[in-house]
Amino acid sequence: MSKTIIIGNWKMNKTFTQTKEFFSAFNQLYIENKNKINQNLDFAVALPAINVAAFSKNTTKLELAVQNMSQFEKGAYTGEISAQMLLDLNVKYAIIGHSERRQYFKETDLDVNAKTQQAIKNNIIPVVCVGETLEEYEAQKTSQVIEYQLKNSLKDVDLSKVIVAYEPIWAIGTGKTATPEQAQQVCKFIRKQTNKNLTILYGGSVSQENIEQLLNQADINGALVGGASLKVDSFIKLLTLNK
């Protein structure tokens, strides 16, 4: 049986002090709810890079992820953080190509591919994000857009070492969400375009109310969660599937 994976994406939230407070509370609540969490579940939080050192306060099975990384190995790239630096801090996952990176920082599929290659080279698992805008969705171009992103973002990539996260852009932080059936349809398409054993996550207004239905879909292996991962109690509810 393949692992189920839940990754919380904190985006640009929480100070270093607030992050330490989160882990202190999480450690206790995890102990209280440990028996409700499926042993086949892997889970992580993607912190702002400046807060990664606070992860040392974690004493649970929780893994460490980041929200971005450099496409370059090392050198004169002011402000960048390399995969080697992240690996040295025990980072397991790197979110790559999130729609906010593509939208606000003009990241291209070429950039995403280069970062993905760097992550794999340094034994970090890349979580490559794909998804369509509201305009593309309404124009019924979802499959076309996803196919193009997959083709270019995953060019020459070993698919056994990558995770793909489908996040319909129109459902990120909007309170809207694709129905489990809609999400399944696109994730099934992603699997058809890639590899039958690929790990596929769904993201986009995932909450404790809808996560179980989403994870019951045949081609959804986990979730990439935004706002619901920022509070200890709601994150624990996600891990226990609201039990």
Swiss-Prot record:
GO terms for molecular function: triose-phosphate isomerase activity. The active site is at H98, E167. Its main location: cytoplasm. InterPro entries: Aldolase_TIM (IPR013785), TIM_sf (IPR035990), TrioseP_Isoase_bac/euk (IPR022896), Triosephosphate_isomerase (IPR000652), Triosephosphate_isomerase_AS (IPR020861). One of its GO terms (cellular component) is cytosol. Belongs to the triosephosphate isomerase family. This is Triosephosphate isomerase. It comes from Mesomycoplasma hyorhinis.
